[in-house]
Each structure stands twice: as C-alpha cells, then as structure tokens.
Amino acid sequence: MSTRRAVGMFILTMLAAALGRCTDMLNSLGIMVIYLLWDNPMVLGYAGFVFSVGAILAIGIVTPLMSEPKGEKFWASVSIQLPMLPVVAMNYYELPLFAVFVNLIVIPALPVVFISGLLASAAGCFGVMPGKLLVFPAFAVLKLYEVLCGLVMKLPGASVITGAPDGYRIFLFYAVMSGFLVAFSLKKRAIECGLKEKGQILYSVQRVVCTAVLIAILLVKPKTAAQLDILDVGQGDGIFYRFESGTCIFIDGGSSDRKQLGENVIMLFLKYNGIQGISYWFVSHADSDHISGLSEVIDSGYTIEHIVVAEAAAKEEAMEELLFKAKEAGIDICLMSKGDSIEINDASGLRSTANEEADGIMCLYPGPADTALDRNDMCLVLKLTDGRFSGIFGGDISSEVEKKLVNEYGDELSVDFYKANHHGSRYSSSADWIEALSPRWAAVSCAAENRYGHPADEAMDRLMDAKCRVFYTMQSGQIKYKESAIYENNRQ
C-alpha cells in the first residue's frame, strides 16, 4: 500500500514537471488517498495505509513548524514520529522511545537504498550478476538497519507499553498537538519579524514541552477497576487478575494445541491492556498446557517480578527447567505451601500466617507432606480474595483432592467464581466440591475439539444443578469479569 502511494505521488510529480506545472506534497498525497479509497474503501482500516499517509502528513504539516537550522535533523525526526505515536500505540500497544535517535542514522541513508534499488532494477535487464552487484549497497544498509534496531531494543526502556489508547486519549492528543502547532506557527512568525533571541529560546522550550505533554497523554492512565480475564488459549489455561490496588497477577499460561501462545496470545493481551509487568505469576503445575506460553513470555524479557510454585512440586524435572530459565532471567522464585498467603494491599509478600480477611492469594493445597501418584493431584490450589470478589483456582486436581479440601475447609471454600478444575473433566468438579464452593459463575477453559472429551457432560450437569452460570472459552472466546459484569468475545 505504501509503495502504491509513493509511486503514485512520484508519477504526479513527474507529470507536473513535464507539463510545466508546479505541485506540492500534500496535494499529491490527497489525490493518491482519494484514488486508493476509491479503489478499495477498506484500506482505511489497514495499518500500512494509515502509517504511510500519516507520515507524509507529518512531513508536510508538522515538520515545517517544528524544525529549525539548529538541531534540524533531530527535530525533523521528532516531528515525524510525534504525530504517529497514537497510531503506533493503536497497532502495537507500545512506543519505541529511541526511534527518534535511530532515525537520525536511518533517514540520511535512505537515498542509498533508493538509488541502489533503481540502478539494480535497470541493470537486471542485462543480467543477474550486474543487478546483484548494484543492489548490494541497499542490502548492506537494510541489514545495518536490522542490526541497529535489534541492538536498540535490547536497551533498558527502549519501548514502553501503553496499551490500546481509547478514543478520548486520541482526541486529547491531537487537540493538544493542534494547539501547540498554532503556537509554533505564531512564534515562527514573531522570530521572522525580528524577535530572534528571546523568541528562539521560548520556541525551543515550547517544542520540548509539547513533546513531553503528548507522550504523557499516552503513557499516563487513570486507575482502573479490578479485572479478571480467562484467556482463550485453546486446550490449556491462562488467567489474569488485576486487584483493586492495581497489582497484577497471572495464573498458568499454556496450551497443548496453540503454538507460540506467549507471543500471539498472552503478550498481545498484556500489551493491549497496558500491563507493564506481572507482580506474581502462579504456576499450578508443569504440564505444557499450563506453562508453554509462560516459557515464551520469560524468553521475551517481559517484566515478571515473582514466579510462585508449589513447594511440594518444585523438584519435578519440568518445573526445575522452568524455574532455572526464570532465575536466568532474574525472576524471583517463591515456594508456596498450604496455609501460605500473599497479601496484596500492604505488599507484605509471602508469609506463613493465613489471613482470609486480607486481600490477596491463599494457598489451600498442597502441603509439605502431601503426595500423589498423579502430577495433576499436586497442583497449586489457590483462593483469591479482593474486596467483595473471591475465586478458586485449582489447576487440574481430581475429585480425590477436592474431597480432601472439602473435609478440611468446608464452608470456608465458598466463593463467587470457580475456574473449573481440569478443563471440565468428568473426574473433577464433584457434587460435594461444587456445593462447598457454591459459586455464582464458573469458567471452563478448553478447546472446541480435543481428544480428552472436555468439558464432560457429567461435570457440567453438576454445575448446572447447583444453579451456577457456566461460560466456555471454546464458545465465548476470552471471558472478562469487570465491575460486576461478565463480558464474552462471542466467537460463534
């Protein structure tokens, strides 16, 4: 799309020169935008079209008002990047803060790529070898771009997660920017009329303030309400919760049928919601359908402060591999046992005195002495409490463990929400367990087609008999609970 726009504008410029007429960038852009929209109105929702048109608009409108002889290249780069920040945030949910400096190297080398490409195209008519030789400078410059961008992205703070900006912030961004541009225009006229030294200093200050204010509009977000999300990960589990205090936790994060789950689902979800880091990432057990995505998230370098696992299961081979990778990434490891709790409000961390009244996470099972032949029965069982909301998350435990917990805790298990154990298996969600929990609603995380027969009709019938509303990721996609309302993506 950007190629069609660029070629069209180039043809218009050449045509104007041949006819002895003058043209300008914005008029040429307007003609090409009308043509492209006439050809296919749907390109308006295509990111490549928006980026291409937006960049030219920035060059034609913003650059003349923000650039000046002193620091011309730097402010030219800023003037192109700044108007595009909301577009970048809408499509990638993060901002590359060092892009301005990278462009100082990239933009001056663009003529090399352009000229080399044209010469190689012409030489290709006479043979492959001349074309290869002439295109080498373009290849070298593009390779340099790739290496440079890779190095920059490894720097601390190279990109900041903003989340998808809402319409209000986008409107505010461009309204404020328009105000600054009017001020820049007036100040430039004053400078040209002779108010040079004092006006020049004020003009420089205005540009810095403009840049800082516009970036702050995208970065600063109001406090949000508590939020629970059951991600659509196929045959697996992935649960996010944000406490009223703003602390974010994640439970599991894996799938047996979705490849690159961490990159394509979990990271996209976290970035879209503007989650800059996870304070506690709980791992129920080390089956791949619970940790495959987490492993990818660790590899990506995303901020995770603590990974929490059951102390009784920490020595399993698969768990040891995951924890080794986490330690290599600088993530703190917490071992949790029955009775331990993490209180969120006072950030007191892991402690061995259970306090059910405090907001946070309490471990119900397993204890140091618990053993089981099946790894599923050594899953971390957690009770979450946050104000008036509470939930139970039991991984893949069977009815045997459920029975043990009912006998030990009884009515203390009562919660609002229940994440169905073992993806709705017939061997979980027993009648006594559901009666003890008495949840208002439950979520089943599984794939529409799986070889395990999840969710089992027997287990779902037991939930329905208890007057519990049941939601399925295989039908609804991602399930969200926020401000006492349940939202579904409605995949079907």
Q: Whereabouts are the PLM-identified features?
A:
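Hydrophobic alpha-helical transmembrane segments in multi-pass membrane proteins
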Residues: M1-V100, S116, G163-P222, A431, ...
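A generic short alpha-helical patch detector that favors 3-5-residue windows
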Residues: L26, V78, L110-P111, R258, ...
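Non-globular, low-confidence helical/coil segments that flank catalytic cores
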Residues: F10, V43, N103, A122-Q492
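Internal helical hairpin/lid segments
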Residues: A109-G124
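Glycine-rich phosphate/pyrophosphate-binding beta-alpha loops
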Residues: A99, I107-L110
